């Protein structure tokens, strides 16, 4: 994921926290805010020191970024997302992280549904 698609500034985080909607599951909390006219979504990641050491926190962030990269075509491009990892995410592998993110994004109805080919 390109750096220009990441939320880094505290003001941008606060704007999404204040004005955005949130939804969660056991592993992640996702805040989303619609940005009109944007041609690509932006994500901000937050992994607390309570989750684990730096290696663990960075691994979780890599997994989240890669999951968003793989789901890029299904994600609404006009939104900004903040993903906050919770403690259970520390013990998950990549596939579990991706599955959990798909679940929480479906709960928030920000993930486009795949076309159903069965009749």
Curated annotation (Swiss-Prot):
What's the protein here called?
A: Ribonuclease P protein component
One Gene Ontology term from the biological process aspect of the record: tRNA 5'-leader removal
Q: What class of enzyme is it?
A: hydrolase
In Gene Ontology terms, what is one molecular function of this protein?
3'-tRNA processing endoribonuclease activity
Q: Is tRNA processing a UniProt keyword of this protein?
A: yes
Task: Write out the catalysed reaction.
Answer: Endonucleolytic cleavage of RNA, removing 5'-extranucleotides from tRNA precursor
What family does this chain come from, according to its entry?
Belongs to the RnpA family.
PROSITE patterns associated with the record: RIBONUCLEASE_P
Which domain of life, per UniProt? Bacteria
Q: What does the subunit comment say?
A: Consists of a catalytic RNA component (M1 or rnpB) and a protein subunit.
The UniProt record lists the keyword tRNA processing: yes
Alphabetically sorted, this entry's keywords are: Endonuclease, Hydrolase, Nuclease, RNA-binding, tRNA processing
Stated EC number for the protein is 3.1.26.5
Pfam families named among the record's database cross-references: Ribonuclease_P
As for what it does, the entry says:
RNaseP catalyzes the removal of the 5'-leader sequence from pre-tRNA to produce the mature 5'-terminus. It can also cleave other RNA substrates such as 4.5S RNA. The protein component plays an auxiliary but essential role in vivo by binding to the 5'-leader sequence and broadening the substrate specificity of the ribozyme.
A GO CC term assigned to this protein in UniProt: ribonuclease P complex
